[in-house]
UniProtKB/Swiss-Prot annotation:
Domain of life, per lineage: Bacteria
GO CC annotation terms, alphabetical: ribonucleoprotein complex; ribosome
Gene Ontology terms: biological process: translation
Cited PANTHER family: 50S/60S RIBOSOMAL PROTEIN L16, LARGE RIBOSOMAL SUBUNIT PROTEIN UL16M
Family, similarity comment: Belongs to the universal ribosomal protein uL16 family.
MF term (GO), any: rRNA binding
Disordered: annotated segments: 138-160
Gene assigned in the entry: rplP
Protein name: Large ribosomal subunit protein uL16
Subunit structure: Part of the 50S ribosomal subunit.
Role of this protein: Binds 23S rRNA and is also seen to make contacts with the A and possibly P site tRNAs.
Keywords: Ribonucleoprotein, Ribosomal protein, RNA-binding, rRNA-binding, tRNA-binding
Sequence intervals crossing the membrane: none
Biased composition (Basic and acidic residues): 149-160
Amino acid sequence: MLSPKRTKFRKQHRGRMKGIASKGNTIAFGQFALQAQDCGWVTARQIEASRRAMTRYVKRGGKIWIRIFPDKPVTMRPAETRMGSGKGNPEFWVAVVKPGRILFEMGGEEITEEIAKEAMRLAQYKLPVKTKFISSDINLSSDSSGEGKTGKDSKEEVKK
């Protein structure tokens, strides 16, 4: 599971999740992505479960990029202990997710939109935040109206 190798401080405050994601909110690596619609904490276990679900469905077809990393420690006190006597020990790691954040990306030559959509659907069942499937609008086909010719070339053809 994902966790930082080392941190400056062992424990953190819980914090607040205000506003929308300012970083990591555009597709950078693949053609298809899973984008968060609301805020929440995504644990390292949930990220791993989502990754496994997508990998199993896609098999060896394409590549999956994980765009979030659990870098926030969540502390817990042992059961049936009295109040006070300090903060609990770190139990697990979470990634703070805000609306608009890209969680996973997928791409590759064998990956169609249907395959990516189904794989992302399986992954979104494992996550505690509401998400939506998005795709980048990169169209690699040539322009059908001019077949890639400039205006000058097409004018010359008309004269002949």
